[in-house]
Amino acid sequence: MLLLPYRSYGTANRLYFIGRVLDNAPLPSPAERGSTLRGLRTMWQRLETDEVPNATVEIGLEGHVTRVTTDAEGYFRINLTPSAPLPWNDGWHPVPLRLVGLPAGVELTGDDAIAATATVLVPPPDAEFGIISDIDDTVVETGATSLPRMFRNTFLREYRQRLPFAGVAEFYRALQVGLNGKRNNPVFYVSSSPWNLYDLLDDYMTHHGLPAGPLLLRDFGIRRANLREGHLDHKLREITQVFETYPTLTFVLIGDSGQRDPVIYREVVRRFPGRVRAIYIRDVEAGLAESKRDAIVTTLAAEIRAEGVPMLLVPDTAAAAAHAVIIGLVTPPAVAEVAIDAAKA
């Protein structure tokens, strides 16, 4: 039995928790290497989950215990208000969880209860801005525009062997540091990948030095609502929730031209006027003649600029960083570090 809390976010007065309960054996660590066959087998085990509905999870927050019940896919989601505003600390708050009940009224007590720790990001009041980034073909090449390449990258290659785009980790760390040097600008990752890949993505981010942040993934369950919700709907919903959680914070949005990121970000700009500092779109066809996809992005960029927000279609991370320093998001020394790493590509 597994109790899997996912990294989430909140404010000093409200915390959002999300996690899942599965009746599966623990999977090998993403750090363990093996044959392609073993990798395929492990990926199948990761995707073929046995969910535990109607399980009871206890959340211990500031001396108070709250119980939440898992849904048909084994997920639990809840917003909690602490008894007093939380201090900032380093931005992350560990919260103890326990799995204390199973379906059919089975209770787990004492040593039988399964424990885990949730971590919740609470940005400080002096954060300069937030960063919201896509993952696939923005941080790491997935090949979402080509099904065979996407299958090969996702299922046949070990995640740790897939290098992030040159300069990405340095650029994201520079944005997190900002101009005040406090490294307290929150980073959020939004992806249409399923929650089943959470441990792989979390390990990947840590291994390659990307700033820690909530990973907002997608439920690929069989419920009708899940089947109806597409790539655009999921991302827009998650980004909207982040914006509404931090109504005084502005954001930098980062994505790619391979899917619907420019369309989603245009809608975000319209819903939240004055809240977007800049948008950087990685050109997945950089170096090629201008394509229909590039033309669409160029048109959208013009529409967004008319709203007062710069949106750039960039060939690489160095180009995004060069613009970011001009508009006061990062420091010149940080841009130099990004350029050095990007030149290694």
Question: What annotation goes with each model-predicted range?
Answer:
Residues M1-P123, R305, T317-A345:
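Intrinsically disordered, serine/threonine/proline
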Residues S8-T11, E51-P53, T69-A72, D112-G230, ...:
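Alpha-helical substrate-recognition element adjacent to the catalytic core
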Residues S35-R38, T56-V57, T109-D112, V168, ...:
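A short linear-motif detector with a strong N-terminal bias
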Residues R46, P82-A84, F171-G178, Y204, ...:
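A generic secondary-structure signal
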Residues W88-D90, P125-D126, N180-N185, Y246-T248, ...:
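Short helix-terminating capping/connector loops at secondary-structure junctions
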Residues V95-L97, G130, V187, F251, ...:
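Hydrophobic beta-strand segments of well-ordered beta-sheets in folded domains
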Residues S193-A345:
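C-terminal cap/substrate-recognition subdomain and adjoining C-terminal extension
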